[in-house]
A protein has these predicted regions:
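A structural signal for multi-pass alpha-helical bundles of membrane permease subunits
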Residues: 2, 8-298
Length: 298
């Protein structure tokens, strides 16, 4: 039983408000810096109240960073990775839960263990595969002594190279597996009696039931893929056509090597531009996101 007293309520609200202020303070500083001119931003201390140059700085940041192109690239990559993760996670969890075969739990735990292997750890072999996606198959053919030369498939500087290496997800597989385990067995038996095969059961029964779970996973993965920096920086050398929004931020803050001081007001405006899409997605899917994580009704 949870006690409700005026003192505990006051302490709880004080803790929550303090945490909210600590979370919002960096965002407020970014917003304030993006609304001032160059001279005001470089004052010590910098004013903590917004100025009247926000639209000017946003326009300059958009033009300087070529955001009309890179925002589209980031959107393509984020949507592609999100859809790929949802499809791969749902299919793998469906196989593990609804099909009985040897080593299925071993396969699940092998997938789950990859949570301890972030992209930074496997960056070198992943890049090697992206440089020639058919090289592992060619090596297998060579070991088996099959005289077949596969063509080179280079994924660098392509949307495929930005998306495909990121679509595997242990988190999504785990979430879908836990959801599928809560689906009543009677529903599966009823689908079998109605003549539904595995694919039809998956598409017409499980997928509609997992809408909230899908929305929660989509929110997490969209924000994660939108904020990717290391992998696009490594796999993209054609910055004019395939650079993403997070990569473009480095060009907004020129250093001494560029012959001019950092323009922090424009850089902060660029951060607001890059921050807007994931914030908008999170706000729009917030209710579905919470329901997908805590809802147990089917």
């Amino acid at each position: 039983m949870i006690e409700r007293t005026p003192v505990l309520d006051a302490v709880t609200h004080a803790v929550l408000i303090s945490g909210l202020l600590l979370l919002l303070m960096p965002l407020w500083i970014v917003f304030v810096a993006a609304s001032h001119d160059f001279q005001t931003v470089n004052q010590v201390p910098m004013p903590l109240w917004p100025g009247n140059h926000l639209l000017e700085n946003l326009s300059l940041a958009w033009e300087r960073g070529n955001f009309d192109r890179v925002m589209l690239n980031s959107l393509i990559v984020a949507v592609g990775v999100t859809v790929g993760k949802i499809v791969i996670a749902a299919l793998s969890a469906f196989s593990i839960v609804y099909f009985s075969y040897r080593l299925r739990m071993v396969i699940f735990w092998m997938i789950f263990i990859t949570l301890m292997l972030p992209l930074e750890v496997r960056i070198v072999p992943t890049y090697a595969v992206a440089a020639d996606a058919l090289r592992p198959f060619q090596a297998t053919l060579d070991v088996l002594g099959i005289p077949l030369d596969l063509p080179e498939w280079n994924l660098l500087n392509t949307y495929s190279g930005l998306i495909l290496p990121l679509i595997a997800t242990a988190t999504g597989t785990f979430l879908y597996r836990q959801f599928f385990l809560t689906v009543p067995d009677e529903l599966t038996e009823a689908a079998k009696m109605d003549g539904a095969g595995p694919i039809r059961f998956f598409l017409e029964v499980l997928m509609p039931l997992s809408k909230t779970n899908m929305a929660a996973l989509a929110t997490i993965m969209f924000v994660w893929s939108w904020n990717q920096y290391l992998w696009p920086l490594l796999v993209v050398t054609d910055h004019q056509n395939f650079a993403t929004a997070t990569m473009q931020l480095q060009k907004i803050v020129p250093g001494p090597a560029f012959g001019e001081p950092p323009i922090w007001n424009v850089a902060m405006a660029a951060n607001l531009i890059v921050l807007a899409p994931p914030v908008l997605v999170t706000i729009l899917l917030q209710r579905w996101f919470v329901r997908g994580l805590i809802s147990t009704d089917k």
